[in-house]
Design a protein with these regions (language model features):
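Sec-dependent signal peptide recognition
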Residues: 2-10
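Mature, Sec-exported extracytoplasmic domains of Gram-positive
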Residues: 21-217
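C-terminal motif of bacterial Sec signal peptides marking the signal peptidase cleavage site
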Residues: 15-19
Length: 217
């Protein structure tokens, strides 16, 4: 009888340990984050260094206006861009939102991203970096990150694309270090064919070869 009782006690302990181990495995890779959006932005800036690319803090009007976010659903936010945004598309928008608003926020950031991508395609400005944008949703944290050092614009598309991908991988590494994962949810729309066939640049001369002065030139 004692042997049977001892056996069942040992079996119970083994099953308990197995259950605890399974629970630990379930939580593996999940990181509880309590940082504000600004603290996350500061971490990205520190870790990425020259690959951060942003030097201007955006205003709340920009968050609610251009991006269309409902600020009543946003607990904390941080947004930065590059002061020379005409040729440097670096952008970082990070928000911590209330329960149930994360996917709505991600949709709005995706819409804003598509406008940036359209501009980059039209003028062929910083295109490879924009194509490597990251849209992260981790719980109630949502971020659109278009980051990376400036590549050589005179290099081939393949070289620029490789460089941009390497820079984006640095962003993934920092984000993964904070949240435990870095799953990119960005959607890259196909080109609509509206850009010209001159490598993305406008031809400033008309069909008759008339070199009229360009406004502002």
């Amino acid at each position: 009888m004692k042997r049977i009782l001892t056996f069942f006690l040992a079996l119970t302990m083994v099953l308990s340990l197995a259950a605890c181990g399974g629970k630990a495995d379930d939580n593996k890779g999940k990181t509880e984050v309590t940082m504000t959006a600004q603290e996350i932005m500061d971490t990205l800036k520190e870790k990425l260094g020259d690959s951060f690319g942003c030097d201007v803090a955006e205003t709340e009007d920009n968050i609610g206006g251009y991006w269309g976010l409902d600020m009543g659903q946003v607990e904390s936010w941080a947004s930065m861009s590059n002061s020379n945004s005409a040729v440097n598309s670096s952008y970082a928008v990070i928000v911590k939102v209330r329960d149930g608003y994360a996917q709505d926020a991600a949709t709005l950031l995706q819409t804003g991203y598509e406008q940036i991508l359209s501009y980059s395609r039209m003028y062929n400005m910083d295109l490879q970096k924009v194509l490597q944008a990251r849209l992260f949703v981790n719980g109630n944290y949502v971020a659109l990150l278009i980051l990376g050092a400036q590549g050589d614009w005179e290099a081939s598309d393949e070289v620029q694309a490789k460089f941009a991908a390497e820079e984006a991988a640095k962003v993934d590494e920092v984000w993964r270090g904070i949240f435990g994962s870095a799953d990119n949810g960005i959607t890259i729309p196909e080109e609509d064919g509206s850009s010209n066939n001159n490598g993305g640049f406008f031809d400033m001369t008309d069909d008759e070869g008339n070199n009229d002065p360009v406004l502002g030139g």
